[in-house]
């Protein structure tokens, strides 16, 4: 007999404003306990020092979390010049001191220009990437060093917000896998004085923006119904995908794992689309070569909407 899952079957997405000093996993577990949710997962780790947008998926939403993991992100960070730390941020130990040359806004902008577009980054040792099954940060804490291959990432936009004698503030929109700590270190190297970040805040992840976030402390002050009202529908994660409407007969075929003939609205073969029945989200389908659709990832609750 299968063991019954503990907790409440809740579906949806919570936009959490992660507090500083809390790991992403700890923040996830705090929220999961607060909602007494059966199943929950986050969609992209933030460093403990970092704050800001951490989308948390509950229940059926966890099926689609990869779409947010792969999404572009936007961050705001303060870059301190003249000091290099072993972690790339203010939580690490300073391992290099350099005098900071007299820099004006034009000097900084000239350096930033070399880091827009496709760039190569060597991931930091203090990261969750794994080597032989172990996170790199564990090896780093043991004083071990592992050679890491450079990875290609994309900085779509990088704006200089303000600058002072000892540092400057940036807003960066980038592809998945971009390490802002490494970006700051590389910019500091280009300026000839080294650098690390002293603050990092995520402002956007995929379709979600910071103005819709909720702090954990604010959620604690709400009753259960008000907390649940803060959850966004599952399909808000997928607004970048086209949508298709399906009739009851076709939806039943799809829910039984079969292909169905529907109006695919001219979508190309192998396209992924959101599927709806009477405005109720059923999941994702793939357009086949012959104009049919095949089930890709459907909600367990979709059968209720198709009846």
UniProtKB/Swiss-Prot annotation:
The positions flagged as active site in the entry are: 47 (nucleophile)
Write out the GO biological process terms.
mRNA pseudouridine synthesis; tRNA pseudouridine synthesis
Q: Name one Pfam family in it.
A: TruB-C_2
Which InterPro entries does this chain map to?
PsdUridine_synth_cat_dom_sf, PsdUridine_synth_N, PUA-like_sf, PUA_sf, tRNA_psdUridine_synth_TruB, tRNA_sdUridine_synth_fam1_C, TruB_C
**Catalytic activity, per the record?**
uridine(55) in tRNA = pseudouridine(55) in tRNA
Task: Cite the entry's keywords alphabetically.
Answer: Isomerase, tRNA processing
Q: What is its EC number?
A: 5.4.99.25
| Statement: the UniProt record of this protein carries the keyword Magnesium | no
Which Gene3D superfamilies does the record match to this protein? Pseudouridine synthase, PUA domain
MF term (GO), any: RNA binding
* Top-level taxon of origin: Bacteria
Functionally, this protein is described as follows: Responsible for synthesis of pseudouridine from uracil-55 in the psi GC loop of transfer RNAs.
Q: Which family does it belong to?
A: Belongs to the pseudouridine synthase TruB family. Type 1 subfamily.
User: Which HAMAP family does UniProt cross-reference here?
Assistant: TruB_bact
- Protein known as: tRNA pseudouridine synthase B
Write down the species: Chromohalobacter salexigens (strain ATCC BAA-138 / DSM 3043 / CIP 106854 / NCIMB 13768 / 1H11)
Its gene is truB
